[in-house]
């Protein structure tokens, strides 16, 4: 089935990378039909939308593609569609303009009238059973039926200051979810965050059914992470006090997802960043299964490429400007 995923435009690359990583990690047979700023059209099994709804962070909606039409020919194209295949009980038509401009209100009424005449069903602008979503891209429409909305409620409610245990400097739940997805794990896999802090990354992984292991050198963070995980109903976890550089697990993990502390702080015992990262990579190699991925954040001023040796390969790299003096760089690194 052809489906359209409306992506967040908070970053030019991360949303698309996250989508494709989830599709691959879930073993879904898919192909990319079309991609652009704010969207991708893929061909995948129908059940795919349920997986994407549960996992994606940087996405808005998932829709079934009904057809394509020139911007000035949408009403004629709508006349050719058997709407009884797509509309049930009640419906609404709402145009989304990614690029370009049209008289949305007039077109929505026109298409709505066509559907109503074809099906005899009522229009419900408040809570429609079916939402028909024509998406304008330059001079054409992709005509879709919405299947799912990616809820933002969790990302608002799980912000660091709303958790039982809070400590400044924690990563946003949306970026944490994205990084877990970029690591290529799926439900049942096991991940490690050796700088777990307040547990934000582990929370997002645990909510997706991933088994989580966390470590931190600070007992306050260890206890706080346990409290936060339990608050979100996550039970399959292990959180231990350990220096990330000395950590040796009995069982290798499928991925490591982490946001190591920047610069010099108590949690790094005053060590310089380069030395900390180099020793962390030694530990990561011991704890990560062959072919497993590390998805980690680092400040732009750290030349991590110079610290990577033949044991690892950098697969992806994304920069996120945080403020004037800091850009966060997300890297996906494979253990070879």
UniProtKB/Swiss-Prot annotation:
The keyword Ribonucleoprotein does not apply. Keywords: Cytoplasm, Methyltransferase, RNA-binding, S-adenosyl-L-methionine, Transferase, tRNA processing, tRNA-binding. The keyword Transmembrane helix does not apply. Signal peptide: none annotated. Its EC number is 2.1.1.213. Its main location: cytoplasm. GO terms for molecular function: tRNA (guanine(10)-N2)-dimethyltransferase activity; tRNA (guanine(10)-N2)-methyltransferase activity; tRNA binding. It comes from the Archaea. PROSITE patterns: THUMP, UPF0020. GO terms for cellular component: cytoplasm. Catalyzes the adenosylmethionine-dependent methylation of the exocyclic amino group (N(2)) of guanosine at position 10 of various tRNAs. Acts via a two-step process that leads to the formation of either N(2)-monomethyl (m(2)G) or N(2)-dimethylguanosine (m(2)(2)G). Belongs to the methyltransferase superfamily. Trm-G10 family. Monomer. This is tRNA (guanine(10)-N2)-dimethyltransferase. It comes from Methanothermobacter thermautotrophicus (strain ATCC 29096 / DSM 1053 / JCM 10044 / NBRC 100330 / Delta H).
């Amino acid at each position: 089935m052809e489906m359209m995923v409306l992506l967040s435009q908070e970053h030019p690359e991360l949303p698309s990378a996250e989508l494709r990583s989830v599709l691959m990690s879930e073993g879904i047979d898919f192909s990319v039909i079309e991609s652009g700023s704010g969207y991708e059209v893929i061909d995948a099994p129908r059940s795919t939308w349920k997986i994407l709804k549960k996992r994606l962070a940087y996405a808005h909606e998932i829709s079934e593609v009904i057809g394509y039409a020139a911007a000035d020919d949408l009403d004629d194209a709508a006349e050719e569609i058997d709407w009884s295949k797509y509309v049930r009980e009640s419906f609404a038509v709402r145009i989304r303009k990614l690029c370009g401009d049209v008289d949305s209100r007039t077109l929505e009424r026109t298409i709505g009238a066509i559907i109503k005449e074809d099906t005899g069903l009522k229009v419900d602008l408040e809570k429609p059973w079916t939402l028909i979503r024509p998406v304008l891209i330059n001079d054409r429409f992709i005509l879709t039926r919405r299947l799912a909305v990616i809820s933002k409620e969790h990302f608002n409610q799980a912000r660091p200051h709303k958790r039982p245990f809070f400590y400044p400097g924690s990563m946003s739940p949306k970026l944490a979810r994205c990084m877990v997805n970029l690591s290529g794990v799926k439900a049942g896999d096991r991940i490690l965050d050796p700088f777990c802090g307040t547990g934000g990354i582990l929370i997002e992984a645990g909510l997706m059914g991933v088994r989580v292991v966390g470590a931190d050198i600070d007992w306050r963070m260890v206890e706080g992470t346990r409290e936060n995980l339990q608050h979100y109903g996550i039970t399959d976890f292990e959180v231990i006090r350990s220096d990330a550089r000395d950590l040796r697990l009995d069982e290798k993990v499928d991925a490591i997802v982490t946001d190591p502390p920047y610069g010099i702080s108590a949690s790094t015992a005053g060590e310089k960043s380069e030395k900390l990262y180099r020793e962390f990579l030694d530990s990561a190699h011991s704890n990560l299964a062959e072919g497993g991925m590390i998805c980690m954040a680092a400040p732009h001023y750290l030349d991590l490429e110079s610290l990577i040796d033949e044991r690892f390969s950098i697969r992806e790299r994304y920069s996120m400007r945080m403020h004037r003096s800091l850009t966060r760089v997300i890297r996906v690194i494979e253990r070879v």
